[in-house]
Structure formats: structure tokens, C-alpha cells
Amino acid sequence: MTSVVEGKIEVDILVIRAGDVLKMAVPSIIFRQDAADFGIQVLDSDGKVKKPGITPAQAANNERILKRIAEILNKFKNYTVTVEGHANSVTGLEEEETTNKYGLALEPLSKARAEFVKTRLKSYGVAEERLSAVGRGGRQPVSRIGDKDNAWKNRRVEFILNK
């Protein structure tokens, strides 16, 4: 006998140890391509993309995740957090990190993503002195270069806990 149950499973924040580093493992926070915000995609009357962005559901989920992170951080005030921004490298070339030859330079873009998330966490009550932001560019991908279906995974932020 087989039964099917439909429902929603809430995914919470986990803390994992990677060597000597504590990271908050969170559901994906999704950014627009070549942007450091949660701008919503706009379609014209024909359904064509007028302004690129993420879906309203993705933006709402991003905010839900950040609120939950802030809630946890506000309970554990003896930790500071480094928000690490990451970007998606298209070429894997070092000049992509610092020049606009292939699109926006990845180092400043990833730093802007980290700063954006830091600002959102502050708006949810996390003290500014507990937060720092760094940009890692496209040097630490989670999806391989050229994997167009999963490139969005490289446009991310990670949360490093410091005691």
C-alpha cells in the first residue's frame, strides 16, 4: 500500500563546522543576475521580460530567510557574523574578478551583495557592530563554470560565525 501526503516542510537554519569555521547553512538567497538586490522581474503585456529580476515568491522567501537569521543572531549575541558575498564566474579568468570586460566585475558585485544583506539584517534588528561584509568574487563556486542551469547557485551569500 502506498500513500501520498502533500504539505510544506519548513527548512530552518543549521550551523555547520567546516574545519575551524562555523557557517550558517541557509536555504538559498537568490539575487538578480549582475545585481546586488532582490529586484522583481517585470513583464510587458506580451509576457516578455521588460526588467530582469527574481520572482515575487523568491523575494519574499529571501526576506523570510533573512528575518529568521536575524532572529537567531539576536538570541546569540556573543557571536559576530561575516557576510560573505559570492558571484558567478562565466569565464573563470582572473580579469573577470576586477574588470567590467565580461559584465560587472565580480569582486565589487559580491561585496555589494554582502553589504545589501548586512543592511537587511540591520533592518531586522541585528546590531551593526556585530556584522561585517566581504566580497569573494567568483573564486569559490558551488556550481561549475558553464553550468547554466545551476549558475544562480553561485550568486549567493554565506554567513560565517565568529566568537
Regions found by a protein language model. Name each.
Residues 1-82, 92-94, 163:
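Periplasmic peptidoglycan-binding/tethering modules of Gram-negative envelope proteins
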